[in-house]
UniProtKB/Swiss-Prot annotation:
Highest taxon above the source species: Eukaryota
Gene Ontology annotations of biological process type: mitochondrion organization; protein transport
Lineage: Eukaryota, Metazoa, Chordata, Craniata, Vertebrata
The protein's name in its UniProt record: Metaxin-3
Species of origin: Danio rerio (Zebrafish)
Gene: mtx3
SUPFAM superfamilies tied to this protein: GST C-terminal domain-like
Summary of subunit composition and partner proteins: Part of a large protein complex spanning both mitochondrial membranes termed the mitochondrial intermembrane space bridging (MIB) complex.
């Protein structure tokens, strides 16, 4: 019997299988690709304090980072992207890069830097899931790392402190969410009725923002106005994580009428398209190599998507 693939990741709350973005991404992709993982939830211990979570352990090999874990699963013939075209594969890479550049800094700020959220939600949660004496200093250490990452990537002159950077990162995050909503349109998933790695990454980034009981949530309020993204998360939770989470729907605000796509959204769309075209050209040779047909996962049937509108790539 083959050794099971073991996944170490953060545990869940707020009706989510995990509260951490990267852990959610890997858990979702494994479900989409039909990978049977032995999931072990971890807390901060002396062994894991410097470790990268999530982690895959298999036959003496340890794999970290979501992109590397997804590549590992593909090599094991668990490939949720098998049926994507070269253009769709390039789009996937471009949108994942956009998430990391535009949305991740705002998520870090929301959960780890915003004083009200950190004091009333983030610190108490991670303190309660960390053993003594790590619970006294580990949350503060993570907050410092989050702040350093934000300033390192976003504090370009003349934006030299977190107060000045804050407006910039939230503005970019809202533009990113608008673009994702526009790209998703009326589809169930970003490439139709079948979820792929892009859906896993988007789910991992926006699900905690939707579900967490944030005392201070300007980005959460903006996301709750994008009804199709809320429904997107709700569909994934219902179809793939019913046993791991409570069977209640996302508490999303009613659909709010939006203004036509503004100039910033058009520029962001053009940027993603340009990066996607470049990746597609670089990817041609790789995709021409032979591939194994992946395992398929039979998801629970969901209601048909509403009338489809064409959306920009």
């Amino acid at each position: 019997m083959a050794e099971p693939i073991e996944l170490l990741c953060w545990g869940g709350d707020w009706d989510l299988p995990s509260v951490q973005t990267d852990s959610l991404t890997v858990l979702a992709y494994a479900k989409f690709a039909g990978a049977e993982l032995t999931v072990k939830f971890v807390d901060w211990t002396w062994r894991t304090i410097t470790a990268s979570v999530p982690q895959i352990h298999y036959e003496g090999t340890t794999v970290t980072e979501p992109t590397q874990i997804l590549n590992f699963l593909r090599k094991q013939r668990f490939n949720a992207d098998f049926e994507l075209t070269a253009k769709q594969g390039a789009d996937t890479m471009a949108y994942i890069a956009l998430l990391e550049e535009k949305l991740r800094p705002a998520l870090l700020h929301t959960f780890w830097v915003d004083a009200e959220n950190y004091a009333n939600l983030t610190r108490p949660w991670f303190t309660s899931h960390s053993p003594f004496p790590l619970n006294f200093f580990v949350p503060g250490r993570q907050a410092s790392l989050a702040l350093s990452r934000i300033l390192l990537t976003k504090a370009e002159s003349p934006l030299l402190n977190i107060t000045e950077v804050e407006g910039k990162i939230y503005s970019e995050a809202k533009e990113c969410l608008n673009l994702l909503s526009h790209r998703l349109g009326n589809f169930n998933f970003f490439f139709g009725d079948t979820p792929t790695s892009l859906d896993a990454f988007v789910f991992g980034h926006i699900a905690p923002l939707i579900k967490a009981p944030l005392p201070s949530g300007q980005l959460q309020k903006h996301l709750n106005q994008l009804d199709n993204l809320c429904q997107f998360c709700n569909t994934i939770l219902k179809n793939y994580f019913t046993d791991a989470t409570a069977e209640k729907r996302m508490d999303c605000s009613p659909t709010v009428a939006h203004d036509p796509v503004d100039a910033n959204l058009q520029k962001l769309t053009q940027l993603v398209n340009k990066e996607s075209n470049l990746i597609e050209k670089m990817d041609d040779n790789l995709r021409s190599s032979p591939q194994h047909r992946p395992h398929r996962h039979e998801a629970k049937p969901s209601a048909p998507a509403s009338d489809r509108n064409s959306t920009p790539a």
